[in-house]
């Protein structure tokens, strides 16, 4: 059983994968997307799905702190709907409030990574945190 976690943004999708037993999440990569050009990185996702034999996706939902949904929640759900259509693999959603903040804090405090380097890995780490939270709550 492999679960793929996604942190869907307007310019990038952070990707993480679980270990085969579903205990831990590891960040994989960041896929560049372009919403204006309808380029959502599905070709690369297809390669990763095949490579890791994914049988579930977990997509982070960026809810507001008061638990309301904003436009990015709708965009994330639309992305999930499209994934289900394309790959015929179930999609679950995980509250991702503050995961990017937590990821940035980890990179600053624990890894002492410069701002430029943080931008290159933060979405991947956020996807890892989203997936790990899902695994901790469900397995």
Swiss-Prot record:
Similarity comment text for this entry: Belongs to the YqgF nuclease family.
PANTHER family in UniProt: POLYNUCLEOTIDYL TRANSFERASE, RIBONUCLEASE H-LIKE SUPERFAMILY PROTEIN
Keywords annotated in UniProt: Cytoplasm, Hydrolase, Nuclease, Ribosome biogenesis
Localisation: Cytoplasm
NCBIfam families (UniProt xref): RNAse_H_YqgF
Species this protein is from: Streptococcus equi subsp. zooepidemicus (strain H70)
SUPFAM superfamilies assigned: Ribonuclease H-like
Stretch forming the signal peptide: none
One cellular-component annotation, GO: cytosol
Listed name of the protein: Putative pre-16S rRNA nuclease
Biological role stated in the UniProt entry: Could be a nuclease involved in processing of the 5'-end of pre-16S rRNA.
Keyword match Cytoplasm: yes
Nuclease among keywords: yes
A Pfam match: RuvX
